């Protein structure tokens, strides 16, 4: 075991950090490279268009990547401490499906994506609270 990864919650934290790092890179490419190309092709003001792209992605893509990283890290953390390969599979499959759902809906249905992301965040938060309570009870039993 490592001090840096000594409970399932650590997987969630690391997953979110990595996913938001990736989201930063991806947003850079969308805001500066993709928006620049589209602005030139459509004869739009680059700064105005790139601002709109950045603003839109800040409410959709960034939370989506953060949630996917949390889901991936949560299930990977469970796998790391249980050895159950079902959790390893879920750590890969669920973010893949959520991202595919996000891409499928796209901008016209973005409110649906936001509602789904919020719902999944609440479910994940509830599961984490249960895990933390379980760990706290285990630690109290060890003290006795």
Language-model features and meaning:
Residues 1-144:
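Hydrophobic alpha-helical segments at protein termini of multi-pass membrane proteins
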């Amino acid at each position: 075991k490592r001090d840096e990864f000594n409970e399932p919650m650590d997987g969630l934290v690391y997953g979110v950090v990595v996913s938001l790092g990736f989201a930063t890179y991806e947003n850079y490419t969308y805001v500066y490279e993709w928006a620049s190309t589209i602005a030139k092709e459509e004869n739009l003001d680059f700064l105005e268009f790139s601002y709109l792209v950045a603003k839109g992605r800040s409410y959709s893509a960034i939370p989506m990547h953060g949630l996917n990283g949390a889901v991936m890290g949560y299930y990977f953390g469970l796998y790391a401490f249980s050895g159950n390969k079902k959790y390893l599979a879920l750590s890969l499959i669920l973010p893949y499906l959520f991202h595919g759902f996000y891409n499928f809906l796209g901008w016209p249905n973005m409110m649906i994506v936001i509602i789904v992301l919020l719902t999944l965040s609440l479910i994940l938060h509830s599961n984490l609270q249960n895990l933390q309570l379980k760990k706290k009870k285990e630690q109290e039993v060890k003290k006795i």
